[in-house]
Amino acid sequence: SGSCSLKTCWLQLADFRSVGTQLKERYDLAKVVRVTRKSRLEPRNRKLGTPTPTDLVHLESSPDYCARNGSSGSLGTIGRECDKRSAGMDGCQLMCCGRGYDHFKVTVTQRCNCKF
């Protein structure tokens, strides 16, 4: 017969949340390296091992996001609200950087223009 079959293959990206989760995991495990005279990457701490091709690496340590830093524009975390029930980035354990936090209850009264 005069027919032919056609196959098409393509690559598809993983969903955004999956990509973000993997990047965060790699960021948390990133290794600090230095560049050698031969332009190779060498770990600053040899106990952590040589980075693999899939590891994230950085030449400088991350800034302290807990403290105010005018040169980087970071306002720090002092005085920010946190959620004591959350284990995420908005949780008091992470956001308060081990400094402790104040717990207080706020009652807000508003006029509502309700009609009964």
UniProtKB/Swiss-Prot annotation:
GO function term, MF aspect, one: frizzled binding
GO biological process, any: canonical Wnt signaling pathway
Annotated compartments: Secreted, Extracellular space, Extracellular matrix
Residues carrying lipid (O-palmitoleoyl serine): 1
InterPro entries: Wnt (IPR005817), Wnt_C (IPR043158)
UniProt keyword Lipoprotein, yes or no: yes
Source organism per UniProt: Eptatretus stoutii
Protein name (record): Protein Wnt-5(III)
Modifications made to the protein after synthesis: Palmitoleoylation is required for efficient binding to frizzled receptors. Depalmitoleoylation leads to Wnt signaling pathway inhibition.
Function: Ligand for members of the frizzled family of seven transmembrane receptors. Probable developmental protein. May be a signaling molecule which affects the development of discrete regions of tissues. Is likely to signal over only few cell diameters.
Family: Belongs to the Wnt family.
Classification via Pfam families: wnt (PF00110)
Predominant location category: secreted
